[in-house]
Amino acid sequence: MTTTLSAVAGQIGRGTRAELTRVSGARSILLYGLVPGAVLLPLAITLGVATVAERFASISSSIQVTSVTTTNSVYWVITFTVMIWAVVAAYAQATAERGPLGELARYLYPRRWTGLVSRWIAYGVGAAVCSAALVALVMAILPTFFPKVYAGVDIGSAAGVRFLVAVPVFAVCAVGIGVGLAAIVGHPAGTVVGLLGWAYVIENAISLVPNGYTLQNYMPFLNGTYGTGQELAFMPPWGPTGGLVYCAAIAVVLFALGCAAVALRAKQVGGRRRSGGRHRQIDR
């Protein structure tokens, strides 16, 4: 038993280090995907909106600019940073099971689920650290440089502390959903389209169907966003903490289904290879 646990821990450790190596480098997705999409984009939009709002508040007496509170200060970080990390993790999982990389993984990781765990750990920790740093940075910058509009933003308030804790938790859950969905779908483009389509189209458009607002209570990304403390018109009956727990539960379920799907595909591929080998022997 101890030997088995040590072997599993070793595989997960190697897989996590491999993912960190894979995501870094001069031409990696870190520089061309994560930094622009998960860091620069939300910062640029947040500061751009803040600059315009502060300008109007300073020069115009005919236009009233509403002050922004803490609970609405990191919306773009939640919207872009969390989702970009989930998409990158999903793409990494989908591509890891295909082509030469997939062939190598079948030999290096006989327990196929350890590869998924490694990716959830690697990208989940990265998403948590990145989102926490951006949340802290944004809530520190806004009231300091844009006081007319963002004076009410307080990183030390209950809402600010919740953001610092809950946004990284939501990011980890979103990465788990992405990895699980990628393992189920098994195709990079299909996974990315499905993930973005669900998060940005279905979860919002479902309110237009009969009983749509009831169905919307069960949307994982909306629950996760609400669970961070972000102001939303969407208000599930189980409250913010319940929304975050629900999002985490969906992530665990999808991840488990993804592990089962990867194991099943590996078994089918192995069966076809053994069958093909027997046929070649008979032909000889």
Regions found by a protein language model. Give the residues of each.
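Junction motif at the cytosolic side of a transmembrane helix
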Residues: 2-6, 246-284
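Amphipathic cytosolic juxtamembrane alpha-helices at the membrane-cytosol interface
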Residues: 109-122, 194
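Membrane-interfacial segments
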Residues: 50-55, 97, 101, 141, ...
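A short amphipathic helical element positioned immediately N-terminal to and/or at the very start
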Residues: 9-27
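Transmembrane helix segments
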Residues: 42-46, 188-222
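Hydrophobic/aromatic positions within or immediately flanking transmembrane alpha-helices
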Residues: 33, 103, 116, 192-193
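Transmembrane helix boundary and interhelical loop/hinge segments in multi-pass membrane proteins
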Residues: 86-108
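Secretory targeting signals
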Residues: 3-9, 27-92, 116-186, 201-204, ...
